[in-house]
Curated annotation (Swiss-Prot):
It comes from Prochlorococcus marinus (strain MIT 9312). This is Holliday junction branch migration complex subunit RuvB. Residues 13-201 are annotated as: Large ATPase domain (RuvB-L). ATP binds at residues 41, 82, 85-87, 148-150, 191, 201, 238. Residues 276-352 are annotated as: Head domain (RuvB-H). GO terms for cellular component: cytoplasm; Holliday junction resolvase complex. Its main location: cytoplasm.
């Protein structure tokens, strides 16, 4: 039960707009993708490429909810950045024929912020909270009764002037997204009826995404080129599309063409210090640092200090792909370069 400032009276739960400016609920309309490349998201599950098992599970849960005329159970989506957690939240709302209101956990600073969001919901709507692992404790505790019983239990005021109030909420679906599942407290995690991991994408799936996007931007990417781009995209659609945009920039400005080949991709990405493995300068610095330690396990904090980078960034941005391609292994004593990783970094004369 959260304590709310006594400055908010019994009839003053429609919090002022300026007090919620950081977390103002935004209703996401059906996307009109005419010429806006930033709205090139899939708008149906059929258009969403990859994650077939996850889509099948969600489809069953959504159809069952529609059949029972109930909101979908609260859903937790977790996985690496750029895999489609936000897009899936929008698709869930669309399939449930409702609206999706969005917020990011760092912007929900005070209990009154989450109160304002919850009171603004209508029956059956989806509330999407990104980076949900970053909710503070008081805000998180307010969500417990909201998720389980669709009510808010508030203590207003303090000491002898304190009073309790329960406010009923419309039935809604909370969709949480996180890159750090272990950072979510057990009480909050257990209140999600559906919990799904979003996996890395296969090269074939990424190739489809690249081909679709290249048609949207009217660029001719040949089959070999899209396959090459897919292989260096770290299994992540966001990276694939970002690289394609950079290659497009190079093709238009330097080569004056709208035809993309493998050779053009290599030249373009070389100018951005990205090599044929999809590794950038930071990745190669990381591998070089481990290589200098002569097969001695090295702690993450030591690596971060040596590179002048944040340990969290290295752990969640750099390391997953290096592990995925077999260049890095984690041991209880620290990080180790694999034989494959050593062979790669030894072959590099890093003059990017």
């Amino acid at each position: 039960m959260a304590i709310i400032s006594s400055n908010i009276g019994d009839n003053d739960f429609s919090l002022r707009k300026k007090e919620l400016r950081l977390v103002d609920s935004k209703i996401i309309p059906e996307e009109k993708r005419k010429n806006n490349l930033n709205l090139a998201r899939p708008i149906t599950f059929q258009e969403f490429i990859g994650q077939e098992k996850l889509k099948s599970s969600l489809r069953i849960a959504i159809d069952a909810s529609i059949y029972r005329k109930e909101p979908l159970e609260h859903t937790l989506l977790y996985g690496q950045p750029g895999l489609g957690k936000t897009t899936l939240a929008f698709l869930i709302a669309k399939e449930m024929n409702t609206k999706c209101r969005i917020a990011t956990a760092p912007a929900i600073e005070r209990p009154r912020d989450i109160v304002g969001l919850l009171l603004g919901l209508k029956e059956g709507e989806v509330l999407f909270i990104d980076e949900i692992h970053r909710l503070n404790r008081l805000t998180e505790e307010l969500l417990y009764s909201a998720m389980e019983d669709f009510r808010l239990d508030l203590t207003m005021g303090a000491n002898r002037g304190a009073r309790c109030r329960t406010i009923n909420l419309p039935r809604f679906t909370l969709v949480g997204a996180t890159t750090k599942l272990a950072s979510i407290s057990a009480p909050l995690r257990d209140r999600f009826g559906i919990s799904q991991k979003i996996e890395f994408y296969t090269c074939d799936e990424l190739k489809q995404i690249i081909d679709n996007f290249s048609r949207l931007i009217s660029f001719n990417v040949d089959d070999e080129a899209s396959s090459h781009l897919a292989k260096i995209s770290r299994g992540t659609p966001r990276i694939a599309l970002r690289l394609l945009r950079r290659v497009r920039d190079y093709a238009q400005v330097v080569k004056k063409t709208n035809v993309i080949s493998v050779n053009l991709i290599k030249k373009a990405l070389n100018s951005y210090q990205i090599d044929e493995k999809g590794l950038d300068y930071v990745d190669r610095q990381y591998l070089s640092f481990l290589n200098q330690n002569k097969n001695i396990p090295t702690g993450l904090d030591s690596i971060a200090a040596g590179l002048g980078d944040d340990s969290s960034m290295l752990e969640f941005v750099v390391e997953p792909y290096l592990i995925q391609i077999g260049f890095l292994t984690r041991t209880p004593r620290g990080r180790l370069l694999t034989a494959l990783g050593k062979k790669y970094i030894d072959s590099k004369n890093d003059n990017f």
